[in-house]
């Protein structure tokens, strides 16, 4: 199966260890236009944590992992099975970092976020795509997405 992870805003506070797992059986992965605001450390762990694979290296075919914003360039473990490319680094400067409401995660650093997304297309060799298509009309707060998407889950207007 193909996995599409795009236009999300992911926040974890400094006291949380972020665990990164990519199953060796993966084939067809797209991770793009996300904001990874991870204040603490991260660690690579083996596959599905309920049934961890035995580890080892393998190339995950049909992978697109690009155009994501990371708070710091040391976030993604170097031994993870997929590695980001064409990444951006910097502080999204959320309205209320650590808050409990979605609106707390409106990015204020517009220069880093606005219109910096890429258009999402099918993963190579994906004959189906997504049932509803790839273009998202509205963000999580109901803001209309126009032209080039922004990074993260919230469209800046």
Task: Place the predicted regions along the sequence by residue.
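Structural detector of coil-to-beta-strand junctions
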Residues: 16-19, 42-43
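Long hydrophobic segments that form regular secondary structure
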Residues: 1-2, 6, 11, 15, ...
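Acidic, glycine- and Ser/Thr-rich low-complexity intrinsically disordered tracts
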Residues: 27-32, 37-157
């Amino acid at each position: 199966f193909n996995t599409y992870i795009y236009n999300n805003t992911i926040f974890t506070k400094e006291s949380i260890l972020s665990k990164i797992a990519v199953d060796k059986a993966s084939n067809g992965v797209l991770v793009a236009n996300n904001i990874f605001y991870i204040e603490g450390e991260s660690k690579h762990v083996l596959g599905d944590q309920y049934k961890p694979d035995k580890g080892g290296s393998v190339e995950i075919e049909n992978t697109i992992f690009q155009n994501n914003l990371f708070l710091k360039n040391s976030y993604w473990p170097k031994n993870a099975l997929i590695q980001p490319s064409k990444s951006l680094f910097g502080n999204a400067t959320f309205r209320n970092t650590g808050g409990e409401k979605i609106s707390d995660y409106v990015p204020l650093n517009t220069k880093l976020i606005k219109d910096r997304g890429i258009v999402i297309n099918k993963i190579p060799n994906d004959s189906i795509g997504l049932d509803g298509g790839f273009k998202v009309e509205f963000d999580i707060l109901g803001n209309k997405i126009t032209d080039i998407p922004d990074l993260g889950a919230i469209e800046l207007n």
